[in-house]
Structure formats: structure tokens, C-alpha cells
Amino acid sequence: MGRRNLKNMSTENIVALCDVDWHYADKTFKDYPQAKRYKDWRQMFDEMGKSIDAVMVATPDHTHACVTAHAITLGKHCYTQKPLTHSVYESRLFTKLAKKYRVATQMGNQGNSFDWCRQITEWIQSGVIGEVYEVHCWTDRPIWPQGLMKPSDSPKCPKTLDWDLWIGPAEKRPYNPVYTPWNWRGWWDFGTGALGDMACHIMDPVYWALDLKYPTSVIGSSTLSNLYSPPHAQVVTYTFPARQQKG
């Protein structure tokens, strides 16, 4: 995701790149040979802060907050990938920081950036299909493992990966390939599961078109769940209050 975002910033001067696994990031590094490379984002800001106007954050969910919040306090404009944060507290913190430091912020959500999303919103709001009382959303996710138990083995960590930096603020544990580079989405300590990863894409257009606010109730059921990993499948029903008539 980060590499794709950077390709859409081809008109900008990319001065620094940061990734905890330089093997995984090799293709991106080669795309921008003039950019200085880092593993630790804190070191990047210390050394390159004066040369950086804005940052793009596309790390695993659990490290969005620490990187983005620090950047905002340094007066850097931020584009952070969805889901914006790993907790409600972090979202509220971002709101306070952005207001205090007056920087431009945006959450990356490609599902809400296409013309079809705006077109459907216009259709619904103009009454083309009449009143909408019920909407069904679904996804083929997870396409990564979920419903897993905590691994008991501890394979050797690749030399190119700084495991301590990858773990970041999460509870420390031995390296295991079941966590990274892709499967972190299916672990509560690092990701938000299929619902957190995809609802922002497929539910946001509904919120936009129907001008929805907060739900009055949320009821969920799922396959067997545990404290470590989101369930294999789930059904969640959101109920919203009646909307005020426009016009």
C-alpha cells in the first residue's frame, strides 16, 4: 500500500523512506534512489525533520498513532492509511493534535476516492432509487489467516527485519512469520481484522450517501473468537436513528 501511495506522489520530492525490513522495502527503495533510508522513524525525524514538509504513513495499524502523532507535533502534514488508528482513544488524540498544530491531515481510503463512490452518493441523495431503509455490505475477507491461537514456537528472525521496531508499542513477543509481513491484519495486537480493514471501504459510501451519524445499537455474531485473533467470519448489524428530511 505504501509503495502504491508513493507512486501517486511522483510530483513530490521524496527525501526519506523508512521501513523496518529493508528486504521487504527493497523495490520501493530502488524507486527513489535519492531518498535517505531509515529503519527507525524517530531517527528519520531527528536527522531529516527540517527537510520534511509532510509524511505518508502506511505501517501496520498498531503503529499509525505513534508515527502520525509525532509528525503532527513537529508541524508535519500527514496522510495516514486506513484504518486511521488502532483504538478510539488514538482517533480522539489525532483530532486534538490536528486542531492544536493546525496541519493538514487525511486518511487514505482508496475505496472512497473513486468516481463511482461520488456518483452513487449523488444518485441516492437525489432520490433516484427512493428512500433507503436497509443496506447490506459484505466482503470476501479475510484473505489472511484469522481465528488463530497464539503461536508457541519462535523461529529465527530474518536479518533484514528489526523485530523490536516492528513490534513498537505492542506487547513484546518472539518473532514469528505468522505476524508479518502480511498477516498482522489478523491479530488484535497489530491489526483490526477484516471488519476494521474493509468496513471503511464498503460502509463509508453508505455513511456518505445517507448522511449517517452514530448508530443507536450495534449487534454482532461470529464464528469462534479468542483474545488473540479476530474470528473467521462475523455478521454485524448497525441500527441508525431516523434521519432528518432535507430540503
Regions found by a protein language model. Give the residues of each.
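Residues embedded in well-ordered beta-strands within globular domains across many folds
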Residues: 16-18, 56, 133-136, 167, ...
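A contiguous active-site-proximal alpha/beta segment in oxidoreductase catalytic domains
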Residues: 77-79, 85-165
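A structural signal for well-ordered alpha-helical segments within the folded catalytic domains
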Residues: 65, 69, 92, 114-118, ...
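N-terminal glycine-/serine-/threonine-rich beta1-alpha1-beta2 phosphate-ribose binding loop
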Residues: 1-80, 85, 89-104
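Short, flexible loop/turn elements at secondary-structure junctions
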Residues: 60-61, 84, 109-111, 139, ...
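Rossmann-like dinucleotide-binding domain that binds NAD(P)(H)
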Residues: 164-246
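Secondary-structure transition/capping motifs at alpha-helix termini
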Residues: 97-103, 126-130, 210-214, 240-247
